[in-house]
Amino acid sequence: MASLMDTLVDRRTHNNAGLLSFSAPTYMQARRFFGSLVRAMYRLEVIGADRLPVTGPMVIAPNHDSVLDGIVLGAAISRELRFLGKAELWQSRLLGWVLDGLGAIGIKRGCGDHLARTRMRHALEAGQAVAIFPQGAICGDRVWHRGAARLALVTGAPLVPVRLVGTARALSRDRIGFPRLRIIFGEPIKVARAQEEPVAATKLTERLRAAVESLA
């Protein structure tokens, strides 16, 4: 019998690799609401958004320090984003329904989730923008994983380094008021379409990490 997690992950198998589950109007409505909230509460400063491609595929790859990161990222980018999130989030029927409506893609971590990678690749090939947090989590070893680089390599989509500043402090218990948040977009890293090789993905991930850490 399949485990609960396997069942939840199987829910992600939509027609055309999940592309039909993406509701752009729903996403944009949520973006306007949460974007206005974040900008008002945290006086969000956006730097370098003009560097982002207006159309076509791109892989957005920020650092990850807080559960607030996805909301801030969505608020700062005018285009619809397909977020990659841990499959555990779909354990809640309500949250899973919301995430599906927003076009998020769940990934079963630690097992090389081929379905999630395929759906992200198809989204890029359809000209969409996807967002992946290479660190994967806001706690633990926080190693920079190769998923974003691998997707960029197999699709030739530009890889965009992004630095989120202040999101960890924004939710800390000892904060005073609402600290100002800043998001900085770096120059997109142009990637030539190539075979998905571990060595190339590792080198590209190292380049991405250096680019993110250089943004201030």
Where are these regions (language model features)?
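A transmembrane-helix-recognition feature enriched in membrane-embedded lipid enzymes
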Residues: 2-51, 92-102
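Non-catalytic C-terminal accessory region of glycerolipid acyltransferases
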Residues: 2-26, 115-216
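Short, basic, glycine/proline-bearing loop/turn elements
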Residues: 33-35, 101-106, 131-136
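Catalytic core of membrane glycerolipid acyltransferases/transacylases, capturing the structured
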Residues: 39, 52-111
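Glycine-rich, highly charged phosphate/nucleotide-binding loops
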Residues: 41-45, 109-117
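Generic preference for hydrophobic
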Residues: 46, 60, 83-84, 104, ...
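A short beta-turn/loop motif at secondary-structure boundaries
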Residues: 50-53, 175-176
